[in-house]
């Protein structure tokens, strides 16, 4: 917002453009991995059970990894396809590598953290056959969740337009 530049869309790839970061297919879905620096890359190789990758001249140093990115990426894809995303999430977390299964909205909202943070608020509106959920703000004020308490005033807002 204050840097004077607008980032370009990067799709599923990490902003760092590191070949060992970004979205990887697993047996059952996507896994986001952020192994952007040498320390994280070494931890990634250890977590994958593939310390031999570090001995390959194509990938030993960061500039070499960048130069040989397609080959490294292909090797990592082959490895990640061998297990489910949640298993990789656990293994890489233990290795100290930032990584997480890409969850659907339903999966995300079912996480204990989402309930603790009260990411949604249940509302009742007599025009709806059942209660519905709306998002709250991502923070609390004086320990309280900030959430809408009444439905939007649609009729009032649209009345001037017919």
Over which residues does each language-model region extend?
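Flexible, small-/acidic-enriched active-site or ligand-binding loops
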Residues: 124-162
């Amino acid at each position: 917002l204050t840097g004077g530049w607008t980032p370009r869309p990067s799709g599923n790839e990490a902003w760092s453009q590191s070949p060992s970061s970004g979205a990887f297919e697993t047996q059952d879905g996507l896994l986001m991995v952020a192994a952007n620096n040498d320390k994280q890359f070494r931890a990634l190789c250890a977590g994958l059970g593939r310390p031999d990758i570090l001995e390959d001249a194509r990938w030993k140093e960061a500039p070499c990894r960048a130069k040989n990115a397609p080959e490294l990426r292909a090797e990592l894809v082959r490895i990640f396809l061998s297990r489910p995303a949640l298993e990789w999430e656990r293994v890489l977390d233990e290795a100290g590598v930032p990584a997480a299964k890409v969850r659907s909205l339903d999966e995300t909202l079912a996480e204990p953290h989402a309930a603790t943070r009260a990411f949604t608020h249940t509302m009742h509106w007599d025009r709806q056959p059942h209660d519905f959920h709306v998002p709250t703000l991502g923070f609390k004020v004086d320990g309280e969740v900030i959430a809408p308490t009444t439905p939007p005033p649609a009729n009032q807002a649209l009345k001037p337009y017919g």
